[in-house]
């Protein structure tokens, strides 16, 4: 079973990815991890990718597809794979298709932008311990102060509202065409099965919807 999992930053994609990989015994594959592993192993593709990255270039889709083919040939991918952060663009989705790498499921965890902004911009972190609070959902006893040490809490740059909104706009610009691409493919070929899963509610509720979509 080959699954593409889509979801905006803060939509809870990581939690569901963990569930899917454990439930179905398939690895989560990200292009970043694959690139790092190939460069470290000094494979032919890894060396090509390294020379491109060292010169400040972007690794081509053809090279990424080559890495994916190599990765899918490994024994732990025998039952399938969960793609994380790939494809991001229509050319990448077309390259997957042209390489004969069929996808069985495309899941999108969908959460309203304002809900994501609320989730992420309210996060506060205690730098020393990594403890995470939230101004609304999990506030510290004293505003802006870590419960244990009494030290100040920080807001990560990634969680600043302006940054969150920018990341969301990038996500939508990339993902909307992808969802349309796979929906048309499903209408034409009956595959992949495309599912739009509301990402609001308890983790258990969302997981149940994911499981139903994959069954």
Swiss-Prot record:
Enzyme class: transferase
EC number of this enzyme: 2.7.4.3
Compartmental location: Cytoplasm
GO biological process, one term: AMP salvage
Region ranges (LID): 122-159
Region described as NMP: 30-59
Binding site for AMP: 31, 36, 57-59, 85-88, 92, 156, 167
Transmembrane segments: none
Major location (coarse): cytoplasm
Name of this chain's protein: Adenylate kinase
Organism ancestry: Bacteria, Pseudomonadati, Pseudomonadota, Gammaproteobacteria, Pseudomonadales
Record gene name: adk
């Amino acid at each position: 079973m080959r699954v593409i999992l889509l979801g905006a930053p803060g939509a809870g994609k990581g939690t569901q990815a963990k569930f899917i990989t454990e439930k179905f015994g398939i690895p989560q594959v990200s292009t970043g991890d694959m690139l790092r592993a190939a460069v470290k192993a000094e494979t032919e593709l890894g060396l090509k990718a390294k020379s491109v990255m060292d010169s400040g270039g972007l690794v081509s889709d053809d090279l990424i597809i080559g890495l994916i083919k190599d990765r899918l040939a490994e024994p732990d991918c025998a039952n399938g794979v969960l793609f994380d952060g790939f494809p991001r663009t229509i050319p990448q989705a077309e390259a997957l298709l042209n390489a004969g790498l069929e996808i069985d499921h495309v899941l999108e965890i969908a959460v309203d932008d304002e809900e994501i902004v609320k989730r992420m911009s309210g996060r506060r972190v205690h730098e020393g311990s990594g403890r995470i609070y939230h101004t609304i959902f999990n506030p510290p006893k004293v505003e802006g102060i870590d419960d244990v040490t009494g030290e100040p809490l920080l807001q990560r740059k990634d969680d600043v509202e302006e940054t969150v909104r920018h990341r969301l706009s990038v996500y939508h610009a990339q993902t909307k065409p992808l969802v349309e691409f796979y929906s048309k493919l499903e209408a034409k070929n009956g595959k992949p099965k495309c599912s739009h899963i509301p990402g609001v509610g308890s983790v258990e509720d969302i997981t149940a919807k994911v499981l139903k979509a994959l069954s």
